[in-house]
């Protein structure tokens, strides 16, 4: 299984926020034997969200989008994903009922806006916050708040299944240049992927 991750948020592009969500998802998917083929960071722009999601939807087995959910002016992910699949958006009664059951702000217009999802989307309840996630075809859309995203991914994790892999980390106190021949020998003789990552101990 090959997955594309799309991280939405102006703050990720300006460096105000570190993209920990993509790193966390990468580790979770790797542990499930799933390959992450691409991570893309894009702004809170409806047209750009639609373009990238449409592109990755066609290229990957599944797309995970994080960020841009909610009723504020810069939360454009719902509309962008809907456009990527040629769908409109609509008030989602099940999402509103869920929000009513867990939110003290259920009567506010702020929460009304949060219950708008693409037509035909499968709602993913938010057990930690308010804004629901959703699924459209092979596209999974999760909140950008890490705690909320973590919880929601745990609910859908069984839907991501790949080939089991083993990862072994070997620390060697030698310059990277001294390892080139041995790395090439490993790659030639065995069906493995080898990465070299210089650090304090190399």
Model-predicted segments: where are they?
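Short glycine-rich or small-residue beta-strand-to-loop segments that form or flank ligand, phosphate
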Residues: 4-12, 62-68, 139-141
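Glycine-rich phosphate/diphosphate-binding loop of Rossmann-like nucleotide-binding domains
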Residues: 1-44
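Proline/glycine-rich low-complexity loops and linkers
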Residues: 34-41, 48-51, 63-65, 72, ...
């Amino acid at each position: 299984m090959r997955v594309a991750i799309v991280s939405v948020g102006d703050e990720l592009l300006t460096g105000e926020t570190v993209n920990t969500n993509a790193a966390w998802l990468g580790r979770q998917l790797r542990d499930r034997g799933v390959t992450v083929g691409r991570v893309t960071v894009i702004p809170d722009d409806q047209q750009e969200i639609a373009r990238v999601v449409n592109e990755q939807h066609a290229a990957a087995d599944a797309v995970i989008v994080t960020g841009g959910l909610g009723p504020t002016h810069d939360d454009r992910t719902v509309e962008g994903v809907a456009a990527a699949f040629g769908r409109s958006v609509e008030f989602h009664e099940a999402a509103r009922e869920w929000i009513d059951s867990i939110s003290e702000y259920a009567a506010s217009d702020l929460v009304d806006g949060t219950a708008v999802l693409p037509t035909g989307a499968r709602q993913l309840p938010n057990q930690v916050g308010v804004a629901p996630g959703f699924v459209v075809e092979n596209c999974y859309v999760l909140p950008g708040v890490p705690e909320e995203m973590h919880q929601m991914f745990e609910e859908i994790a069984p839907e991501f299944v790949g080939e089991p892999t083993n990862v072994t980390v070997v620390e060697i106190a030698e310059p990277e240049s001294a390892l080139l021949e041995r790395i090439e020998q490993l790659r030639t003789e065995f069906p493995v992927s080898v990465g070299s990552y210089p650090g304090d101990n190399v």
